[in-house]
Regions:
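Extracellular/lumenal carbohydrate-interaction signature centered on repeated Trp-anchored short motifs
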Residues: 116-132, 199-207, 264-270, 294-297
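Extracellular, beta-strand-rich glycan-interacting domains
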Residues: 130-140, 265-289, 302-310
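Extracellular glycan-recognition modules
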Residues: 99-180, 281-285
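Extracellular glycan-interaction patches encoded by glycine-rich segments
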Residues: 246-272, 287-291
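Short boundary segments that mark the start of a structured unit
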Residues: 1-101
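Extracytoplasmic low-complexity segments
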Residues: 89-107, 292-342
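Short, solvent-exposed beta-strand-to-loop segments that form ligand-recognition rims
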Residues: 225-252, 288-291
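Extracellular glycan-interaction surfaces
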Residues: 96-106, 137-139, 168-239, 332-342
């Protein structure tokens, strides 16, 4: 047995093939934004792993929300009788800028309403395709699993299309539930088919998680941190109506963040990056957009960052410019130094 020396070389060529095969929209990192320390690695005799080279990036030269990709290729191999498997000659190094921002802390004392989602002219009244996504960090979970006080609402519409922790019926208060999932031809959520489900995991406090529901007109898929965890084929397709929610007495409520069944069932935790789309986002798009997306992205109806920047009237700006600002209710504070990717 002999040592094997492998020479590597950054190859900043086109990445169209990589994007096409993965469904991503990566860009080449800007010139001078990264360094590669060394070009050679050694596989010691009798070993199966090589030494390492270090790739460093200058975050000041990277943009928020952009996924960068750099090709690194094997140019030569010396020693032993190993040959390069051509399909593995090139590796792709992913670079993403770490974002440090504030997040809204609801503390079971506050929430946000989206008044412009209600009414006959609502942009979310009949969604033939849809993506709903959000980042949350639970601070605590209720102790009363067998009452409505054990529910922690995240975002959506009560008795219609809602993400929450717990169900108030004895299930653990730290399990994520997707409630009702109303989809169908009828306009009223109660008259649609229902596709609710649970995430079979009990969550801990103090950790960020990203969840999403994606509907493409036929299939409803649920994602956790960019990975698909559930899917169901709808019986008859149809639309989703996020303009209506049950307030405990009537259907005059609408989409809200951090509450449900009226002003109740609040969430004790941080929230960030809530978005509603009229397109079905792909797995790769969800992964790439966990921390940030371009507010002008196609199909993006509304986008709230909850990063501490508020308007004169106290609302949180809809970053798309469509005017669906989030109206605060109750006591909401903002916490510093929240990092993403998490």
């Amino acid at each position: 047995d002999t040592d094997v020396k492998i020479v590597l070389q950054p190859n900043p060529g086109l990445i169209d093939e990589f994007n096409a095969s993965t469904g991503r929209n990566c860009q080449l990192p800007p010139e001078g934004s990264y360094t590669v320390e060394g070009t050679e690695v050694i596989i010691d005799a009798g070993k199966s792993q090589s030494s390492q080279i270090k790739v460093s990036a200058n975050s000041d030269k990277l943009q928020e929300g952009v996924s960068y990709c750099m090709r690194v290729s094997i140019t030569s191999v010396e020693g032993g009788d190993l040959k390069v498997l051509e399909s593995s000659r090139t590796a792709y190094v992913m670079l993403t800028k770490v974002i440090t921002i504030k997040a809204a802390y609801l503390a079971r004392k506050g929430c946000f309403d989206i008044p412009s989602f209600g009414g006959e002219d609502s942009p979310v009244k009949a969604l033939g395709q849809m993506t709903l996504e959000m980042k949350v960090l639970p601070v605590s979970f209720p102790t009363s699993a067998s009452s409505a006080n054990g529910i922690s609402s995240l975002c959506g519409c009560e008795e219609n299309f809602l993400f929450r922790f717990g169900d108030g019926a004895g299930n653990p208060t730290n399990k994520l539930q997707f409630v009702k999932g109303s989809i169908g031809a009828a306009s009223h959520p109660d008259k649609k088919d229902h596709y609710e489900s649970w995430v079979e995991k009990e969550f801990e406090t103090g950790h960020w998680l990203h969840f999403a529901a994606v509907y493409d007109g036929q299939y409803l898929r649920l994602y956790l941190d960019g990975e698909q965890i559930h899917f169901v084929e709808t019986r008859n397709g149809g639309t989703i109506n996020l303009s209506m929610a049950y307030d405990g007495h009537t259907w005059e409520d609408t989409f809200a963040i951090g509450r449900s069944a009226g002003y109740a069932r609040f969430f004790d935790g941080y929230i960030s990056e809530c978005r509603v789309w009229n397109v079905a986002r792909t797995t790769a798009e969800l992964e790439d957009g966990i921390c940030y997306v371009d507010p002008t992205s196609e199909g993006l109806i509304s986008y709230w960052r909850f990063d501490g920047e508020t308007q004169e009237d106290g609302t949180v700006l809809d970053m798309t410019g469509h005017g669906h600002n989030a109206k605060p209710y109750g006591d909401i504070t903002y916490v510093d130094n929240q990092k993403c990717p998490f």
